[in-house]
């Protein structure tokens, strides 16, 4: 079950994966907007200000790493949590988290349904963690 009214920006250059994940996340209750490359991702993120961004690392035009750094450097998007999507089996978790990612998710082409369910659960966990931090900061 999605965090109520959560807007997700899905940045994925593979049309198949973009459409499949958009469908699965919409079915899980998220409002999904998409981008197919790094340039489009930066524009959409700035224009739509999603609650969370799912960012593929291997993108045309601008790499996911550059997009992540640009998002974190922009005051309008700096506080939007980013979940990095990667198909790389050996992820440098410390480097990704140090660059500002809230989490990473290893894409699996073997079982897209289970992968989409795990992705939705990861999104919910990150959004809940951000909401808890925001609520604690507001009370302080």
What are these regions (language model features)?
Residues 1-7, 114-140:
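Non-catalytic signal-transmission and effector/linker regions of two-component phosphorelay proteins
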Residues 12:
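Conserved acidic carboxylate
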Residues 15-33:
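Two-component/phosphorelay signaling modules centered on CheY-like receiver
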Residues 37-40, 63-69:
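Acidic catalytic/metal-coordinating carboxylates
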Residues 48-54, 59:
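Active-site beta3 strand of CheY-like receiver
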Residues 60, 69, 78:
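The feature encodes the CheY-like receiver
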Residues 66, 88-124:
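Alpha4 helix (beta4-alpha4-beta5 surface) of REC/receiver domains from two-component response regulators
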């Amino acid at each position: 079950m999605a965090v109520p009214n959560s807007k997700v920006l899905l940045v994925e250059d593979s049309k198949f994966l973009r459409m499949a994940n958009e469908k699965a996340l919409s079915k899980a209750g998220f409002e999904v907007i998409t981008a197919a490359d790094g340039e489009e991702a930066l524009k959409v993120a700035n224009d739509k200000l999603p609650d969370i961004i799912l960012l593929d690392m291997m993108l045309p035009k601008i790499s996911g790493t550059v997009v992540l750094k640009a998002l974190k450097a922009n005051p309008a998007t700096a506080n939007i949590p980013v979940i990095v999507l990667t198909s790389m089996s050996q992820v440098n978790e410390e480097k990704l988290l140090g660059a500002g990612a809230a989490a990473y998710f290893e894409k699996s082409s073997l079982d897209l349904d289970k992968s989409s369910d795990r992705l939705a659960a990861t999104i919910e966990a990150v959004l809940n963690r951000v909401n808890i931090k925001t609520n604690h900061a507001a009370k302080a």
